[in-house]
Amino acid sequence: MQSTNAATGGTSLLRLMAPVLALVIGSTMLSACSSSTPSATVDGAPVTTLNMASTTGYTPQAINGGTDDYHCTLVNPQVKQNSFIVSSQFFPGTGKSVAEVHHAILFLVPPKLVRAAKTADDHGKGWTCFGEPPVLGTGIAQFLAMPWLSAWAPGHGKDVMPLTTGTPLPKGSLIIMQVHYNLLAGDLPVTPHVQLDTVPASANLRPTSIQPLPAVPNIPCPTGVTGPRCDRSVELKNLAKRFGSYITTFDAGLETICGQNPANPPSGNTTTCTWRVRTAGYIVRAAPHMHLLGKALSITLNDGTAHAKTVLDVPNYDFNYQNAINIKPWIKVSPGDTLKVSCTYDPTLAQKLPQLRKLPPHFVTWGDGTSDEMCLGLVWQVPLNASTKVDWKNPTGGIQIGGPPGGHRPGGRPGMPATSANG
């Protein structure tokens, strides 16, 4: 999708940003073992449950003076045949350590990238996902196009795909599990667990894909609150120190795509970005994501027109209840349609919430940390044609949206669609 105000140089900008557009959704995973158990059926197709559990757990560690840890781990789900994921659930562990998990994302590693992924995994130890992880080496660009399989945040619960739909999982694929650990909530060992319910490709489901829709927040310190980091330029330097220089490149690129001057974007307690649909399809599911200052998030189809339609409206956002919803009836989108994501924040919460009030006041913009912010709508999409066949060597599916997919990106977060910024 594309911002309606994107500059004509958007295509070149996206290529420039490719190495960093995967940075935002921190990651954490664990050594995992897989087991499969035949379960129920979906439209007569047998359901296989894949359980991927940590064997040792992971103890998060913040670096560079930060309070967050993004860690990636490679998991082998032991997929023996082309399959569709019909439901998934991430379990952030048990006990007090549950509060440390800010979010988790599962990325598909198709068979053609398995060898490179195993190299990146450093013999099962995983890797830190801030900036451009050197462990990924020259292969980082390939990871940017990896589809999302599932995304979790507090309160998200189980992802159950709408009937007749499923997320492609090719035979021989691996999974990268990212987990973002928030050390403001603690630093105990965490033992996540993932469960996937799959059916064979013969079920002929309509393939789903997840499209992130980001906008950059620029939230000044509240009236009467002062400090050195209340200056945006000072805070950008702090972000670069904590997460790497990619973060300022990412912010500037996304500002440009959303029609703003990256050197002096408008600041305030709201932000928006409008993206353009490039192919026909249906939106079947949606979810919000902001951090602790978030108050409201919405996604609107063709905002400002006689045909405007609300895709998602969360007027009372709660970080601890970031649930996704299945949309009924499905919302049809066509080339040229727009999707506008809008977010509202309350910066005074930084002086009220226990996790944030211990920190110095600061200007808040897009960043990987829990004390930073995001504006990210997620939509699950399927092709318009129910008989669309899956390319199992390169499964993407769904509609295409011009511009970059936002959201957390560890050193160039995977999930970028094959689209241009010029719609």
Q: Predicted regions span which residues?
A:
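Bacterial signal peptide processing site
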Residues: 34-36
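Beta-strand-centric surfaces of beta-sandwich/beta-rich domains
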Residues: 38-282, 287-423
